[in-house]
A protein has these predicted regions:
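Short coil/linker segments at helix-helix boundaries
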Residues: 126, 149-187
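Conserved, well-structured interaction surfaces
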Residues: 78-150, 180-183
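Sec-dependent bacterial lipoprotein signal peptides
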Residues: 1-12
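Secretory-pathway/luminal and periplasmic proteins that interact with or process carbohydrate-rich
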Residues: 51-56, 71-73, 142-153
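Membrane-proximal, proline-rich intrinsically disordered regions
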Residues: 14-61
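Short alpha-helical hairpin
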Residues: 65-89, 166
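Glycine-rich, acidic and aromatic/proline-enriched surface loops and short helix-turn segments
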Residues: 149, 191-194
Length: 194
């Protein structure tokens, strides 16, 4: 009985707050950017995403070539075969191009939502402008990749056909924006690159 009494008293005295543990690997979006060093670290993370095999270290590079008629995938079972044969479904297709580019855009939007609120000294103004310029350029670059990959060529109809959604604010996974026209996409790209 004594053991059971101790067990009951120990479990009854515990609260549920031990279950509310903050993540040690994630930073809340609202407080992610506190200074220019945080911006630089975040940009390094974006560049790291860009060099993954799902983006510029692989699929983004060869997809355009192997789906055309100027190259050929000669061995079956290789990573280019399904693209070459156009043998994929809507669920197994080139979704990594979409998700990685929008991951870059989302991270850029997080930086841009907070960077103007930073207290920047006069000595750091050039550094600030460089970091903000890189962020805008990366967002525009990712939108350019998406537009040329998933949109109809601008020259075919003057950009009137559908391109991809333009996302310029921090969004959550439930946000499902509608597609913009190719012309609107290129306007947004040029705006980011100016």
């Amino acid at each position: 009985y004594m053991m059971m009494g101790m067990l009951v008293s120990l479990t009854a005295s515990c609260g549920n707050d031990w279950l509310d543990v903050e993540s040690s690997t994630k930073i809340p979006t609202e407080t992610a950017i506190q200074n220019l060093d945080d911006v630089e670290y975040s940009l390094n993370g974006i560049y790291d995403v860009m060099r993954s095999t799902n983006y510029y270290s692989g699929r983004m590079i060869y997809y355009g070539d192997v789906t055309g008629d100027d190259t050929q995938s000669i061995k079956t079972g290789k990573r280019t075969t399904s693209y070459y044969m156009l043998d994929y479904t809507k669920d197994s297709g080139p979704s990594s191009h979409w998700s990685y580019a929008y991951k870059i855009i989302q991270n850029c939007n997080i930086i841009l939502s907070q960077i103007d609120g930073l207290d920047v000294s006069e000595d750091d103004t050039e550094y600030f402008n460089d970091l903000k310029g890189q962020t805008l350029a990366l967002r525009g670059f990712a939108l350019f990749d998406l537009t040329r990959f998933f949109g109809y060529p601008y020259a075919k109809d003057g950009g009137a056909s559908l391109g991809v959604p333009i996302v310029t604010e921090v969004s959550n996974t439930e946000n499902k924006p509608s597609r913009n026209t190719v012309a609107q996409c290129y306007e947004a790209i040029i705006k980011d690159l100016k």
